[in-house]
Amino acid sequence: MARIASVNIPDNKRLVVSLTYIYGLGPTMAAEICNKAKISKDKKVKELTDQELIGLRNIIESEYKVEGDLRREVTLNIKKKKDIRCYQGLRHIRKLPVRGQNTHSNARTRKGKAIAIAGKKKAVK
């Protein structure tokens, strides 16, 4: 397995598909990286030479934020919104959907498991 950006990418898949295993790289960015490195997108990772792998690593490290750096940036952005108490920050604090989704009947995943409301107890005669 080739190791790029501290991620083991699968050998038996096409290069474009393998690059998407790296957090922060989707299909479009993976294709863009292949074009910059002048490597065929259909080439399998196990067919790449050491020079091509080094070239891919250099392009990814120098031009893109991936893995730990990207995760840290996203976390800091969310923390900043929470600190300034903007609307999105308040939604994060309350663990509700942030981008305007309905919550009356949906958003179970974000809100957590449904809590049963205790029924009224019958009066004893």
UniProtKB/Swiss-Prot annotation:
GO molecular function: rRNA binding; structural constituent of ribosome; tRNA binding
Keyword field contains Protease: no
GO biological process terms, semicolon-separated: translation
Xref: InterPro entries: Rbsml_uS13_C, Ribosomal_uS13, Ribosomal_uS13-like_H2TH, Ribosomal_uS13_bac-type, Ribosomal_uS13_CS
Record Pfam families: Ribosomal_S13 (PF00416)
GO CC terms of this entry: cytosol; small ribosomal subunit
UniProt keyword list: Ribonucleoprotein, Ribosomal protein, RNA-binding, rRNA-binding, tRNA-binding
HAMAP family reported in the protein's UniProt record: Ribosomal_uS13
Record's function text: Located at the top of the head of the 30S subunit, it contacts several helices of the 16S rRNA. In the 70S ribosome it contacts the 23S rRNA (bridge B1a) and protein L5 of the 50S subunit (bridge B1b), connecting the 2 subunits; these bridges are implicated in subunit movement. Contacts the tRNAs in the A and P-sites.
Oligomer and partners: Part of the 30S ribosomal subunit. Forms a loose heterodimer with protein S19. Forms two bridges to the 50S subunit in the 70S ribosome.
Similarity comment: Belongs to the universal ribosomal protein uS13 family.
Protein name: Small ribosomal subunit protein uS13
Gene: rpsM
